[in-house]
Amino acid sequence: MLVDKRIYLASQSPRRRELLKQIGIAYDVLPLRAVSGRMDVLEVAHAGEAAPDFARRMATEKAACGWRAVDLRRLLRFPVLGADTVVELDGDILGKPADRAAAKAMLARLSRSEHRVHTAVAVQHESRVDVRLSSSRVKFGALDDALIARYLETGEYLGKAGAYGIQGRAGAFVEYLEGSYSGVMGLPLYETAALLREFGLAV
């Protein structure tokens, strides 16, 4: 058992850090880029890859990349957690916008639309890897050009799938949400806690 031990978080997301703290998980952030050059995961969907499968694959690859970093840096061998969030609209995957124009286009598409948010969380320890998925339905109200422009000025869209963060000002865009609020934020707490317990952590 790894009771009261730490994990490594293979993510720079402040939201995921906050959520792990919320459920009492001790962690160290694992900066993948600092290990033997760039170790980033290429976040590109395969042709025909469904959004939930893409999220699972990305989370698994991030955890695996983190585990390689543990090996290379000869770190204490705690489990590595990776996660990935994707927004799906009409079968299209909306990832992190490349720039402000891309963010504006995404938000315009999400206006008055129901979309799905898929967040996968994966844990690797030695050769063992497991993954869980949370999928939620989110409906936005009407977003006119002025409202989108004001939101873009906040910069909240940066680094966020679908160009919004539900825990920030975009929370006012949500007409309804069916599923996991923490999953839409970026780390589904129910699935995360269940997965960490399977790896022997006290949650």
Swiss-Prot record:
Query: What this chain does, per the record?
Result: Nucleoside triphosphate pyrophosphatase that hydrolyzes dTTP and UTP. May have a dual role in cell division arrest and in preventing the incorporation of modified nucleotides into cellular nucleic acids.
The molecule here is called dTTP/UTP pyrophosphatase
Q: Name one GO molecular function term.
A: dTTP diphosphatase activity
The site annotation (Important for substrate specificity) covers: 15, 85, 167
Pfam families (UniProt xref): Maf
* A GO cellular component entry from the record: cytoplasm
Q: Which reaction does it catalyse?
A: dTTP + H2O = dTMP + diphosphate + H(+); UTP + H2O = UMP + diphosphate + H(+)
Q: Which organism is it from?
A: Thiobacillus denitrificans (strain ATCC 25259 / T1)
